[in-house]
Amino acid sequence: GLKPPKSLEGRSLKPLLKDPLTEWNGTAITQVLRPADKRLPKPVMGRSIRTERWRYTDWGEGKSGVELYDHAADPMEFNNLALKPDTEAKTVMERLRKLLERKASGKVPTTPFNPKRL
């Protein structure tokens, strides 16, 4: 394969592609720009961090919503723990939010984008 540029963060997923059951520690971070529509007056950036057990997502840096799911108890993500967080959920959300803030911006890009491509 190609050598990644030194400026690119991350690590190869090749071991997981070869063996999906291989040990993997760490987190996965994703971002998605949700365009304005009937429900949203303006675009909002969503960003997520996923550990082996948890997925934390905030929309518009938390101003447009927050989600927390415990994949050990709720692998299909039916119960958003951020809606009524207990002490453990509050602690997890704070820890994951801090990690996420270091890696991904919650701001909507200022450059023009084509919503039809989303």
Walk through the language-model features, giving the residues of each.
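Short clusters of small/polar residues that mark proteolytic maturation junctions
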Residues: 60, 80-82
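C-terminal cap/loop subdomain of S1 sulfatases and analogous C-terminal strand-loop tails that border
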Residues: 2-71, 101-103, 107-110, 116-117
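Short amphipathic alpha-helical coupling segments at ligand-binding clamshell hinges
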Residues: 92-96
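Cytochrome P450 catalytic domain signature, combining two hallmark sequence patches
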Residues: 24, 87-91
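Short, polar/flexible loop-turn hinges at active-site or ligand-entry regions and domain interfaces
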Residues: 1-5, 82-86
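Intrinsically disordered, low-complexity polar regions and short flexible loop motifs
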Residues: 74
